[in-house]
């Protein structure tokens, strides 16, 4: 099974890269977790933010192949417990399609990306810093896998 986090933003601090890679490497080879970074467009004082978000959304969608699943991470998405995420992970595995987890930039996801989503997931009603979201997603995917495999990490 292939999971990809497609996230707007690049050049993250070292601790973010280390955190992400720590959880990605813990997963078994049959569950790959990869990161695809979409460069954040420069936001100047007079920038057309709607246009920039649309461009970022187009770049995100260009990384998705026909037939692949899109799951957006949104404040108004559905919150999942660890056990519910494990159930979703198992369903995704059985579905045998690549799953693309989409995280937008500072202003969120483009409407075009949200319109393509098969599922909408909310990590929290809180506004979370996007670098931290990457690590949280990696950790939660790893935790869900440990639930499914009976590993003692999740107690």
UniProtKB/Swiss-Prot annotation:
It holds the Pfam family SPOUT_MTase. One of its GO terms (molecular function) is rRNA (pseudouridine-N3-)-methyltransferase activity. It catalyses: pseudouridine(1915) in 23S rRNA + S-adenosyl-L-methionine = N(3)-methylpseudouridine(1915) in 23S rRNA + S-adenosyl-L-homocysteine + H(+). It is found in: Cytoplasm. Keywords: Cytoplasm, Methyltransferase, rRNA processing, S-adenosyl-L-methionine, Transferase. Coiled coil: none annotated. S-adenosyl-L-methionine binds at residues 73, 104, 123-128. It is an enzyme of class 2 (transferase). It comes from the Bacteria. Its EC number is 2.1.1.177. InterPro entries: Alpha/beta_knot_MTases, RlmH-like, tRNA_m1G_MTases_N. The keyword Transport does not apply. Transmembrane segments: none annotated. Its main location: cytoplasm. One of its GO terms (cellular component) is cytoplasm. Belongs to the RNA methyltransferase RlmH family. Specifically methylates the pseudouridine at position 1915 (m3Psi1915) in 23S rRNA. Homodimer. This is Ribosomal RNA large subunit methyltransferase H. It comes from Pseudomonas putida (strain GB-1). The gene is rlmH.
């Amino acid at each position: 099974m292939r999971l990809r986090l497609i996230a707007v933003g690049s050049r993250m601090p070292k601790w973010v890269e280390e955190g992400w890679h720590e959880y990605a490497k813990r997963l078994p080879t049959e569950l790959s977790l990869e990161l695809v970074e979409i460069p954040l467009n420069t936001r100047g004082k007079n920038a057309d933010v709607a246009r920039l978000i649309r461009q970022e959304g187009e770049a995100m969608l260009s990384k998705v192949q026909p037939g692949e699943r899109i799951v957006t991470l949104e404040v108004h998405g559905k919150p999942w417990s660890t056990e519910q995420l494990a159930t979703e992970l198992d369903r995704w595995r059985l579905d045998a399609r690549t799953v693309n987890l989409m995280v937008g930039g500072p202003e969120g996801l483009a409407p075009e990306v949200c319109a393509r989503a098969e599922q909408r997931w909310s990590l929290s009603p809180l506004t979370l810093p996007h670098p931290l979201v990457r690590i949280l997603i990696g950790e939660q995917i790893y935790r869900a896998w440990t639930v499914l495999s009976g590993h003692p990490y999740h107690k």
